[in-house]
Design a protein with these regions (language model features):
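Active-site phosphate/pyrophosphate-handling residues
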Residues: 7, 42, 100-104
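Acidic, PIN/NYN-like endoribonuclease modules and their adjacent C-terminal/linker elements
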Residues: 1, 103-104, 108-132
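Structured helix-beta-strand junction loops
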Residues: 32-34, 70, 91, 124
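Active-site neighborhoods of divalent-metal-dependent phosphate/nucleic-acid chemistry enzymes
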Residues: 73-115
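Short, well-structured N-terminal submotif of metal-dependent ribonuclease cores
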Residues: 1-39, 52-62
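A generic structural signal for short hydrophobic patches within well-formed alpha-helices
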Residues: 9, 44, 121-122
């Protein structure tokens, strides 16, 4: 199984950018069943938070609903994932908490890789990042 980082969804939904079309194509391949991938509950929370913070709630609602349509099964973040994230934060200075949580879930659940544009994942042992 492959984990999809929030930035893939945000680029696909966002304004023109070099990462937009590769993100759209990846999500289309996932939606068609060509690639088996999922997201976690933190990804959905990040979508809600970001669009509310930038006062674009109507867009945020649509992006959230599309994510739920593409990813009907969402992995729940547990206290154990948070415990693992805390350990990663101890081990990697400069690592952001949300990235640590995604990485911890990926490692704990033995995911194959994470699709992301965030190079911070490259520093973490046990995490394989793939850029679309």
């Amino acid at each position: 199984m492959i984990l999809i980082d929030t930035n893939i969804i945000m680029y696909a939904a966002g304004a023109p950018h070099p990462n937009k079309q590769p993100s759209v194509r990846l999500l289309e391949r996932i939606a068609s069943g060509e690639i088996e991938a999922t997201i976690n509950t933190e990804t959905l929370q990040e979508i809600l938070h970001r669009y509310r913070a930038i006062k674009r709630w109507n867009d945020g609602r649509q992006v959230y609903d599309l994510a739920r349509q593409i990813f009907p099964v969402v992995i729940s973040v547990t206290a154990e994932h948070l415990d693992s994230a805390r350990k990663l934060l101890d081990a990697y200075s400069g690592l952001m908490a949300r990235d640590a949580l995604h990485a911890a879930l990926l490692i704990d659940e033995k995911f194959e890789s994470i699709y992301s544009y965030d190079r911070d994942f490259d520093k973490i042992a046990g995490v394989r990042r793939v850029q679309p």
